[in-house]
Amino acid sequence: MSWALLFNSLALALPVALATVTVGWLAALFIASSRGGAQLLALGGVIVSLALPPFLVVNVWLGLLGNVGVLKPWLPFDIYSHGGVVWVLTLMLWPLPCLMSLGALKRLTAEMLDAEPGLCGWPLVRSLLLPMTLPAVLQSGLIVFALAFNNIAVPAILQVKVFPAQFWVQFSTSYNFELTWQYGWAMAALPLALLFLLRGRAFAWPWESQGVQAEVLRNRLGQALLNLVSVAVCLFVALSVLLPLGHLLLDTRSWTDL
């Protein structure tokens, strides 16, 4: 077994988990403090982003930042790299922490806010919102870590050597089942450990509670924090949903190959 590839996969999954829980938490805060059309659009973007196939997301960024990408002359970022895989996986997986953090935020009540009427903005986040959502953040981070570690499609397309992709290539070319038992334990160990850690733990889902009214939460967050979460949501919905769908709909091959 290649320990170097195994550690490379672990080093890939960690930044993906950290990035997705950060973006997902900010997006959850935006949804919890929004109402009407803005809330529905954000939720729709979260769900669509989670449902998009990996090859569609990767193809968009290959067209933009690949060897002959449109933006390559102006943005010399190597998409065929460790950082490129982290970026694409972050765009694919941030909805999971968003939905789980939103469920935790939905448990916020007016009584909790009234207990500390002077808490607003960042002090409110630090003293109340982060502690009450921390279990959901940790749970979602572990799930994303396992998904990123075992992802095969994105690293394989971007030609980044990681343990699952290398294992799949070797097995698919030789159909060596002894190799499966010898190396496959590393891929199975992480999800099994995750199931063990999360056994018996309750997940807070967004539809289980109504939560505090959006107007009340918005007033307590303050304009600066609202602007930050709004920019984060708009940016990631645009990059992870509108960009892939726009590429799919505007590409003439999408219609000629039907």
What spans do the regions from the language model cover?
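Solenoid-repeat scaffolds in large eukaryotic assemblies
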Residues: 116, 179-180
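Short amphipathic alpha-helical coupling elements at transmembrane boundaries
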Residues: 43, 66, 110-118, 127, ...
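Short helix-to-coil transition segments within interhelical loops
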Residues: 106-133, 160
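Peri-membrane helix termini and adjoining interfacial loops of integral membrane proteins
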Residues: 63-74, 158-164, 205-213
